[in-house]
Design a protein with these regions (language model features):
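Acidic-and-aromatic substrate-binding clefts and catalytic sites of carbohydrate-active enzymes
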Residues: 78-91, 115-119, 154-157, 198-205, ...
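N-terminal pre-domain/capping segments
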Residues: 2-145, 166-173, 180, 217, ...
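Acidic/histidine-rich catalytic cores of soluble enzymes
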Residues: 172, 176-271
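Short aromatic-enriched loop/helix-cap "lid" or pocket-rim segments at secondary-structure transitions
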Residues: 49-50, 158-160, 208, 235, ...
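Hydrophobic faces of well-ordered beta-strands that scaffold small-molecule active sites
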Residues: 33-38, 74-76, 107-112, 146-148, ...
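Short helix/strand-capping connector loops at secondary-structure junctions
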Residues: 47, 277-290
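Active-site groove signature of glycoside hydrolases
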Residues: 138-161, 189-198
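Short helix-capping segments at alpha-helix termini
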Residues: 28, 103-104, 185-191, 214-219, ...
Length: 314
C-alpha cells in the first residue's frame, strides 16, 4: 500500500478507526522518516537579502547549508522567492530544483500566504488564485505539498475581527469552499494542499480535522505544526491529527515561539511512528522576541536533537 492509498483509505474511516489502522502501518514503515529544513528558520536573513539590507541569505544558499548539515530535504517557502507574491521565472524554479538534485536534497514542500477568514470575498478569491499559481510552482519544483493557512496571518487581527461578525460555521464554510477549489486544481498536478494549524481559527486538533473533513478532498490534508495547538496538552492534538498528516512543522517548543519549554522529541517521534506517517519531518526554528537568535547555530543543534530522537525510536 502506498502513502496516497493509505491517506485516501483513512479519509473513509471514522476517527475511532485511526487507532487501529495507524499502528499497523507504523510497523511496516517505521524507518522511513527524513529530516528537512523549513526556510522560515532563516526568516530575517532571507528578508534581508530580498530587501537589500546587508548580505542576508537566499534560498539557493540555504541549499548549500542543507548539504553541509546533511538534511534530506528543504522546504523552499514561496514568499522567499524573487518577486513574491508574483510567480518566479521558470528559470529560477528550474535552477532551484537542479541545485537541490545536484546536492542530493529533496524538495519537501513550499508555502504561500493567504487569508480565507476575511469577510471580503474578493480577497479570498485572490488567495485561491494565488495558491493555484503556486501549486504549479510546487509541481515544477517537485514539491509534493504546498502549505496554506486557515488562519488570519495578521498579528493585530484574528478571524473574528476580519470576518466582520460572521459565525464560526460561516467562516469554516468560506475556508472549506476555497480550499476545495484549490485542491481540485492541485489534483491535476499531483500536489497536496497542506493546511497548517496556526493558533487562530485552528487552535485544536479537532478543529483542524473538522475543517479537512468539510473540504472532503483526498488532495487536501493537515500539516501538523507542533508548536501551534493552543490547548492544555498539545501532544494530544498532535496525536489526533498525525494519522492523516501530509507534512509537519517540528518546533522547538509545543507552547509557542516565546516558550522555553522544550519539545519532548522522543515523545513526539513515538506519536509520529505510531501514526504511520512516512516522509519528511521539516524543522522550523523561530526567533524569540527580544532575544538573540543565530539560525546557523540553533538549526544544527535542533537538527541533532531530532535525529537523536528518530534513532532512539527506530
Amino acid at each position: 500500500m502506498n502513502r496516497r492509498t493509505f491517506i485516501q483509505g483513512l479519509s473513509l474511516l471514522p476517527l475511532s478507526g485511526l487507532a487501529v489502522a495507524a499502528p499497523q502501518a507504523a510497523k511496516k514503515k517505521s524507518a522511513t522518516l527524513k529530516v528537512s529544513l523549513n526556510a522560515y528558520s532563516f526568516n530575517k536573513l532571507l528578508n534581508d537579502a530580498i530587501r537589500g539590507r546587508g548580505e542576508g541569505v537566499t534560498l539557493m544558499q540555504l541549499l548549500d547549508f542543507c548539504a553541509r548539515n546533511k538534511f534530506d530535504g528543504f522546504d523552499a517557502t514561496g514568499y522567499f522567492m524573487p518577486g513574491y507574491p508574483a510567480v518566479p521565472p521558470d528559470s529560477y524554479i528550474d535552477g532551484l530544483r537542479k541545485k537541490a538534485a545536484d546536492l542530493g536534497i529533496g524538495i519537501s514542500g513550499t508555502g504561500v500566504r493567504n487569508n480565507f477568514t476575511t469577510a471580503d470575498a474578493a480577497v479570498r478569491q485572490e488567495g485561491v488564485n494565488h495558491i493555484k499559481q503556486y501549486v504549479e510552482v510546487a509541481a515544477r519544483l517537485g514539491a509534493p505539498v504546498i502549505r496554506v493557512f486557515a488562519d488570519t496571518q495578521m498579528r493585530a487581527e484574528n478571524w473574528e475581527s476580519v470576518s466582520k461578525g460572521a459565525t464560526r460555521a460561516q467562516v469554516q464554510d468560506w475556508i472549506a469552499t476555497n480550499l476545495r477549489e484549490c485542491a481540485e486544481h492541485a489534483a491535476k498536478f499531483k500536489v497536496k494542499i497542506g493546511v497548517q494549524n496556526h493558533g487562530d481559527f485552528l487552535k485544536t486538533g479537532q478543529e483542524l480535522l473538522t475543517l479537512i473533513k468539510a473540504v472532503g478532498s483526498p488532495w487536501c490534508g493537515p500539516i501538523v505544526d507542533t508548536g501551534y495547538f493552543k490547548t492544555p496538552d498539545p501532544y494530544v492534538d498532535i496525536a489526533l491529527v498525525a494519522p492523516t498528516s501530509v507534512n509537519w512543522q517540528v518546533k522547538q517548543s509545543p507552547l509557542g515561539e516565546d516558550s522555553e519549554v522544550p519539545t519532548d522529541l522522543p515523545k513526539l517521534l513515538r506519536i509520529v511512528r505510531n501514526s504511520g506517517y512516512t516522509g519528511y519531518l521539516p524543522i522550523e526554528t523561530l526567533s524569540p522576541r527580544g532575544k538573540p537568535y543565530d539560525p546557523y547555530a540553533v538549526v544544527p543543534a535542533f537538527l541533532k536533537e531530532l535525529r537523536d530522537a528518530i534513532a532512539q525510536t527506530a
